[in-house]
Amino acid sequence: MYCNIKWLNRSLIYYGGAMSSMNTNERIVPLLPLRGVLVYPTMVLHLDVGRDKSIQALEQAAMDENIIFLAMQKEMNIDDPKEDDIYSVGTVAKVKQMLKLPNGTLRVLVEGLHRAEVVEFIEEENVVQVSIKTVTEEVEADLEEKALMRTLLEHFEQYIKVSKKVSNETFATVADVEEPGRLADLIASHLPIKTKQKQEILEIISVKERLHTLISIIQDEQELLSLEKKIGQKVKRSMERTQKEYFLREQMKAIQTELGDKEGKGGEVEELREKIEQSGMPEETMKAALKELDRYEKLPASSAESGVIRNYMDWLLALPWTDATEDMIDLAHSEEILNKDHYGLEKVKERVLEYLAVQKLTNSLKGPILCLVGPPGVGKTSLARSIATSLNRNFVRVSLGGVRDESEIRGHRRTYVGAMPGRIIQGMKKAKSVNPVFLLDEIDKMSNDFRGDPSAALLEVLDPEQNHNFSDHYIEEPYDLSKVMFVATANTLSSIPGPLLDRMEIISIAGYTELEKVHIAREHLLPKQLQEHGLRKGNLQVRDEALLEIIRYYTREAGVRTLERQIAKVCRKAAKIIVTAERKRIVVTEKNVVDLLGKHIFRYGQAEKTDQVGMATGLAYTAAGGDTLAIEVSVAPGKGKLILTGKLGDVMKESAQAAFSYIRSRAEELQIDPDFHEKNDIHIHVPEGAVPKDGPSAGITMATALISALTGIPVSKEVGMTGEITLRGRVLPIGGLKEKTLSAHRAGLTKIILPAENEKDLDDIPESVKENLTFVLASHLDEVLEHALVGVKQ
């Protein structure tokens, strides 16, 4: 609603006594709601009216002395206001002129008459009418009122001089007004205040109170204008200083150009300064960077230190300080990506989905620090990349294998020639975001020497309570790593220091079963190798039984790395046949695998074909997963020597001695000659002799093999066993049960004897493996012997 405001210089209706010469009884008049415009009594202005009900109200007023009630809406965006949407106090006005415009709207000239209050809201079909009653002003006409009028005029005059938004002619018009109420209304209309405040002034009946209110409002406006003026002066001075600096720098450039000095760094410094200010780095870091920049500006370009500082500035600006990728908080989609890239590995996938779920609820969770432990080839590194994809995060990998210098992690101090940041800061630069998935690969392969311990430097990186303030020796300023999701990989935990291990969440990844390997080969390895060797699915078909043949007789691993190499070999052979023999299709079956890969490399099935005396099959946990361990015992006449061979470690030797002592203490019960240790030499050998072996879990296996050799009772070829033995014959729990069980399954064993306390670990073993194995839970060696020795009553 547009308006042109004009004020009458005469008192049309009232002032000085009664408010109006009109009938003060209640009367019904049409309502014209106003949006963002307020009309005071005696005000004349143009209004553009376009709403249907408003046009109908004007037409209704034309039939009844052109009288209409003007009331302001509380909210401007309401097109059809109801009773609660308009203010109850408004102005009765007279329509002086009405003109219809080409666009269908009406332009009307109205003149405010007096204040009125709505008594009843009457809404009809096409028009809204209101029952109103006249509001009479409270005029006292005393000396205080005159003093207030004079004070108001003085403040208004000062306001006009400062603001320069009101003309002197307007002030002259205002100064001629003698009625206090009209004076207050006239000044209120010229003040740049909100319409809500203007409505409040309209609703004030007491003229004195209205004058007081306006004096207070003008004083507030004067203070605001004074503050604006001060701020403007500060801005002006700042701009003048900036312009002066710019002018001087331009002069310096011109002088350098005239002198032929090409080493001036003015433009470069300004560019660096702008980049620093826009980088988003913390305030303290920014101060340090600007301080270094000032040093750089003063140094000659030929100075060696100038190059050091410039390199430092480049590193600071290359780091991500605020840039972050938005996490994909879609559990279903993330799970789909993880399942597509990797088969199995449910624990890791579940942990990632748990992190996403908590992140969705809190949006403030620190990045987890995971450590994936498992044998080579099970997909630890590639899984970390899939985690990054599922989270929609950038991925960066740092290999820690062979790192033995603490400066590799923390960087070198800038005082050294060729100093650089450590691998963590270098990785963050590559990541280009503050929340990447950061892979610390082969964390168990670090070592230490006289230059420091890199694993100790990682303690700060992998501590959620400290890594928000990580300090690199080169950067020398704190860098926030708390939003990074660290994923470490290791083949074994034994070489990782305890404090570092304590900071990580360990997730063990055991080897794959045969069925899992077949699935991985079918869905992932074979399509990849076909593509790399230029073959199509129609050129080479590998049946499942052929894949199983390759897994059993050409690989002996927990992962699938060797399996992939063997499949690649099959593809190469097939490619050669297709090119030379011009055959378009090759089908690999169980029978022709030997033609492509040659003779079997490994023997699948039972370690021994017959039950043997003095030989028992143990289960071992290695860096490559699990494996079977044949333990041989030979008894020969001698002087009671106990010989241990097979490159055994101290713990394994002590297990053999504990088993030997247990058998001596129960020789009669076991039906063994009590003096056997004096008349015989006993030799325990654990092949392969060149491979180091250690650990307590072969205790019951050595005890069983010893008893078998001393009693002449053979050990069942179908049984594998694992467990630590005590001098009392108790069987203690061991670790790595899943890996050991998978190795027993690969070897074709059908029965496994394990400590009773390891029963809880059976849940981790795949059902496809459990179906083919019988588990015997033993708490004492007697139970082991019942199931391991052939012919012993159970």
Swiss-Prot record:
Induction: By heat shock. Keywords: ATP-binding, Cytoplasm, Hydrolase, Nucleotide-binding, Protease, Serine protease, Stress response. SUPFAM superfamilies: P-loop containing nucleoside triphosphate hydrolases, PUA domain-like, Ribosomal protein S5 domain 2-like. ATP binds at G374, P375, P376, G377, V378, G379, K380, T381. GO terms for biological process: cellular response to heat; protein quality control for misfolded or incompletely synthesized proteins. GO terms for molecular function: ATP binding; ATP hydrolysis activity; ATP-dependent peptidase activity; sequence-specific DNA binding; serine-type endopeptidase activity. One of its GO terms (cellular component) is cytoplasm. It catalyses: Hydrolysis of proteins in presence of ATP. It is found in: Cytoplasm. It comes from the Bacteria. Residues 29-222 form the Lon N-terminal domain. Its main location: cytoplasm. Its EC number is 3.4.21.53. The active site is at S697, K740. Residues 610-791 form the Lon proteolytic domain. Coiled coil: none annotated. Belongs to the peptidase S16 family. NCBIfam families: lon, PRK10787.1. ATP-dependent serine protease that mediates the selective degradation of mutant and abnormal proteins as well as certain short-lived regulatory proteins. Required for cellular homeostasis and for survival from DNA damage and developmental changes induced by stress. Degrades polypeptides processively to yield small peptide fragments that are 5 to 10 amino acids long. Binds to DNA in a double-stranded, site-specific manner. HAMAP family: lon_bact. Homohexamer. Organized in a ring with a central cavity. This is Lon protease. It comes from Bacillus thuringiensis (strain Al Hakam). The lineage of its organism: Bacteria, Bacillati, Bacillota, Bacilli, Bacillales.
